[in-house]
Structure formats: structure tokens, C-alpha cells
Design a protein with these regions (language model features):
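C-terminal non-catalytic interaction/assembly regions of soluble proteins
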Residues: 237, 241-296, 300-304, 308-314
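A short beta-strand-loop structural module common to alpha/beta enzyme folds
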Residues: 25-35
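Short, structured coil segments at secondary-structure junctions
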Residues: 23, 109, 256-257
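Donor nucleotide-activated moiety binding/catalytic core segment of transferases
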Residues: 41
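N-terminal basic/disordered segments at the start of proteins
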Residues: 1-26, 305, 312, 319, ...
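Short secondary-structure junctions
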Residues: 26-28, 173-176, 302-305
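Conserved mixed alpha/beta catalytic, RNA-binding, or beta-rich assembly cores of soluble enzyme
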Residues: 12-18, 34-36, 44-46, 50, ...
Length: 332
């Protein structure tokens, strides 16, 4: 988590520096040769994962108001008074982690964390906090309220998962029966009207002809996801053979999706563990019988879940990093 602290007084600056000593981040003082409030808020709202104001809540609210979008993208915002008595999360308490951050900041300076979200106030399972702890994307943030409201009303919520979840489920959270509708689902392949939580564990293996354009890769990727019902947000990285390390179309495709891309030699790919879809043609060109599956496995350190799909000179395969979810949803 990248953090940015802003203070307004000498006393506040001393507290911000103390907090940053324990929870590192940039520290600025508004005015006195430092940044202006509006400029600082605009820059840090776009850059940082968390903004920490040491000052009045009203100042922080006015500073961030022009930049707030929605709970899926807004950073965590926490305000502490300059004496360090209270730590108040005011934005992105669950998905952004502001509630947990407020507790952590409070522990550093002896403040009282002032947590106002209903699930936390009532000691009820917060599905969006759980998703963040399990490194999952929330596909439909608007459906969070439905799950939380049901738990707050005392009713059970039902879930489905493609992965075994360690530990005991929180109170009120029960597995959905075969014929029952799930309220939320831990899945790579969303379907229906449940709240879908997507583990960010996928690595996309890529093979392509020389000169393949970004547009061709995008079209093939859309077909790949549609054919399998795959949530593309599960993918966090890509991999291919080193022969493609300077392909402009492939590099731009990965950059546009925000994926780091790892390239491997034919010898490295040949030593990838597992069974792969062989191609004599691919071997004749690259020196190894399969690029996309082998590259995905090496980069993920896991196994193939979607084998090679080929079309229009592009091949994709998906491997998963090891993933062991549990029912932890609060920081210890």
C-alpha cells in the first residue's frame, strides 16, 4: 500500500512523521513552502493507495470531494486529529482498506479508531473486506450492499466457491445447496446475479505470429474470455517466449492491460513441468512444442486451467498461481 500523509501544523507534522516511521509513506505539510491542499489531494488521489490527513475531518472532506468516484477505485482516506486522539476512516473503509489502516495508525499513536461502517459496528462479516484480504476483485460493487444488508438483518447469506476455503465460515455465512441461489461466489467464471469475487491469480500465456497487432491480440483475447466465460480481471501477468520480447503489438497489448510480461527461452520452456498441447509447427519455428501453456505455467508457478486456444495466428492459455483462501476477514 502506498501512503501519503498531509499535515497542517508543526504538531500535526510531528505526528505524521511518527506514523510514517511505522507505516511508511510520503509526508508533506500544507503551505509553508509545501504543496497546496487542492493540488496535493488531486495528485495523491490519483497516485496513492491511501491518503492520511492529520487535521480536521472537514478539511479532508472538502479536499477529496472533487475526486471521489466509487468504492471500487477510490483510495483509502483516514483522518487523525493532530493530538493523535482519534483515527477516522472516511472513504473506502472496506475495499480500500481504510478501516484496517485506521486501526493500524491508531495502534502506532494510541488513538481510538472510529469505525462507522455498519458491518464493523455490529461485528458482522464484511464480504468486501474479506475479498480484499483474499486478493480478490469485486466484479459488481453495487451488489455488496445486498449481502451486507441480509447479514445485518440477521438472515443467512449463501456462497459458492470453486476453491476450498480453509477455516470456519463466519456466523450467518453458509454454503449454497445445489438448487439454491448463491448470494456471493468465489469464482473465475461469473454467472448469474450473485456478487462475484474474482481471485487475482491468473497468468496469461501468449503465442503469436511475428507482426501480430495489438488489435488482433485484443480481438483474440475477447474471444478467449467469451468462449470460457472467464473474468479477465483474474489475470495479473502475462508470459511468452523470448523471441517475442520485442513484438510491439504484444508489448502494447500487455501494457494496456497493466500486466507485467515475462519472457522465457526455448530451453526454459522445454523444462516446464506438466503435460502440454504439442505442435510440430510451433517446434519448427521456436524450438519448443508449445509456447503459451509452458510460459503460463512457468510464470504462475502453478497449473494450467484453460489450455491452448488458437485462432488467427494467436494462442492463449491460462495458468493459476497457488491460491489458498481462508475465512480471515479482519486484521489480527
Amino acid at each position: 500500500m502506498t501512503r501519503a500523509y498531509l499535515a497542517f501544523t508543526e504538531k500535526g507534522l510531528a505526528l505524521a512523521q511518527k506514523l510514517a516511521g511505522a507505516l511508511p509513506g510520503t509526508v508533506d505539510r500544507c503551505g509553508h513552502g509545501g504543496p497546496g491542499l487542492a493540488d496535493w489531494a488531486a495528485e495523491q488521489f490519483a497516485r496513492a493507495d491511501a491518503l492520511i490527513f492529520v487535521g480536521a475531518v472537514g478539511i479532508a472532506v472538502r479536499a477529496i470531494a472533487p475526486h471521489c468516484q466509487n468504492k471500487a477505485v477510490d483510495p483509502a482516506v483516514v483522518v487523525l486529529d493532530e493530538c493523535g486522539h482519534f483515527a477516522v476512516p472516511i472513504l473506502s473503509g472496506h475495499l480500500g482498506g481504510a478501516n484496517d489502516l485506521a486501526r493500524a495508525l491508531a495502534a502506532v499513536c494510541g488513538a481510538v479508531p472510529v469505525i462507522t461502517t455498519a458491518t464493523d459496528a455490529n461485528g458482522v462479516f464484511a464480504v468486501d473486506t474479506w475479498a480484499r484480504h483474499q486478493n480478490c476483485a469485486v466484479l459488481e460493487p453495487g451488489r455488496i450492499k445486498r449481502v451486507s444488508s441480509r447479514l445485518l438483518a440477521g438472515g443467512p447469506v449463501r456462497y459458492r466457491s470453486e476453491f476450498p476455503i480453509a477455516g470456519q465460515a463466519p456466523a450467518g455465512v453458509v454454503p449454497a445447496g445445489e438448487a439454491e441461489r448463491a448470494d456471493f461466489a468465489l469464482t473465475l467464471f461469473p454467472a448469474g446475479d450473485a456478487l462475484h469475487l474474482i481471485p487475482k491469480i491468473g497468468v496469461l500465456g501468449i503465442g503469436c505470429r511475428r507482426g501480430t497487432s495489438t488489435a488482433q491480440l485484443e480481438a483474440a483475447f475477447a474471444q478467449f474470455c467469451a468462449a470460457h466465460g472467464l473474468a479477465a480481471v483474474c489475470i495479473t501477468a502475462a508470459a511468452s517466449i523470448d523471441l517475442k520480447a520485442h513484438e510491439p503489438g504484444l508489448l502494447e497489448f500487455c501494457r494496456a492491460h497493466g500486466w507485467p510480461v515475462q519472457f522465457y527461452s526455448a530451453a526454459q520452456l522445454q523444462n516446464a513441468p506438466g503435460q502440454f498441447t504439442p505442435s510440430a509447427f510451433v517446434r519448427s519455428v521456436t524450438g519448443v512444442d508449445n509456447v503459451c501453456e509452458r510460459a503460463a505455467v512457468l510464470a504462475a508457478g502453478g497449473t494450467i486451467i484453460l489450455p491452448k486456444q488458437a485462432g488467427n495466428g494467436v494462442t492463449f492459455a491460462l495458468a493459476l498461481r497457488p491460491f489458498a483462501p481462508d475465512w480471515r476477514w479482519q486484521d489480527a
